[in-house]
């Protein structure tokens, strides 16, 4: 089990509440900062997720930790019957709703404030479930994964997009330098929440990846 990393170490709130508070605070400039910090690569990764999901021709899609809705907007091109974006941060969802309205996709995409560990859906509801850069923010990873399995249809597809730590030189050293030093500096300069991007860096570095994460999924 990975170490529990929280945004605000001096707060008495649980991780779930802290994560919601943090993303509410940074929601308005999250998209712009995300493009800068990821060097735009996050867009390419999301396109790959859409490609994988599209092969299943899903009718019901759920995007967990949907944030400002980048992925649900892209998945609208798959023409499913229904797309639901779920997130614990109302602030992020408000930004996403404005983007969806601008794209005239409000009749296709539904945005819901909700907890990934206690989702308001029946068993076996979705043909496809996606989580992009969100599982490391789960307060209880095992519980969140079990809840995903509950609402996913038996023949459905789950696609999780997450950062991981490179293991080979020089990528390992370059990644650590960027995430430990450059990313927090960018966050402190441009973000309203000075600790948010330090948390995002720390949580990414401590989260299980590769075989370790696959073992969690297979439990």
Residue ranges, per PLM feature:
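Class I SAM-dependent methyltransferase SAM/SAH-binding core
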Residues: 60-64, 68-118
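A short glycine-rich, Lys/Arg-flanked "PGG" loop and its adjoining helix->strand segment in the class I
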Residues: 142-157
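Short catalytic micro-motifs in class I SAM-dependent methyltransferases
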Residues: 133-134, 162
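Conserved alpha-helix/loop element of class I SAM-dependent methyltransferases that forms part
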Residues: 29-32, 38-59, 74
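C-terminal alpha-helical "lid/dimerization" subdomain adjacent to the S-adenosyl-L-methionine
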Residues: 17-18, 88, 161-217
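Hydrophobic beta-strand segment of the Class I
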Residues: 30, 129-130
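N-terminal auxiliary segments of SAM/dcSAM-dependent transferases
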Residues: 1-20
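A short acidic, Gly/Pro-enriched loop at the edge of an enzyme's catalytic core
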Residues: 117-128
């Amino acid at each position: 089990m990975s170490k529990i990393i929280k945004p605000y170490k001096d707060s008495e709130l649980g991780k779930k509440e802290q994560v919601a508070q943090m993303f509410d605070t940074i929601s308005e400039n999250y998209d712009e900062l995300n493009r800068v910090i990821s060097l735009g690569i996050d867009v390419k990764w999301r396109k790959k997720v859409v490609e994988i999901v599209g092969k299943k021709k899903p009718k019901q899609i759920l995007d967990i930790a949907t944030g400002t809705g980048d992925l649900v907007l892209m998945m609208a091109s798959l023409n499913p019957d229904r797309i639901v974006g779920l997130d614990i941060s109302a602030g992020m969802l408000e930004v996403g709703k404005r983007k969806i309205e601008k794209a005239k996709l409000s009749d296709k995409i539904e945005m819901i404030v909700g907890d990934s560990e206690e989702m308001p859906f029946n068993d076996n509801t979705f043909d496809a479930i996606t989580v992009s850069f969100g599982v490391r923010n789960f307060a209880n990873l095992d519980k969140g994964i079990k809840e995903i399995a509950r609402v996913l249809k038996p023949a459905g597809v789950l696609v999780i997009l997450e950062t991981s730590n490179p293991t080979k030189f020089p990528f390992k050293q370059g990644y650590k330098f960027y995430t430990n030093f450059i990313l927090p500096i960018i966050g402190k300069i441009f973000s309203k929440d000075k600790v948010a991007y330090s948390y995002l860096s720390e949580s990414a570095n401590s989260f299980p990846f590769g075989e370790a994460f696959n073992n969690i999924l297979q439990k």
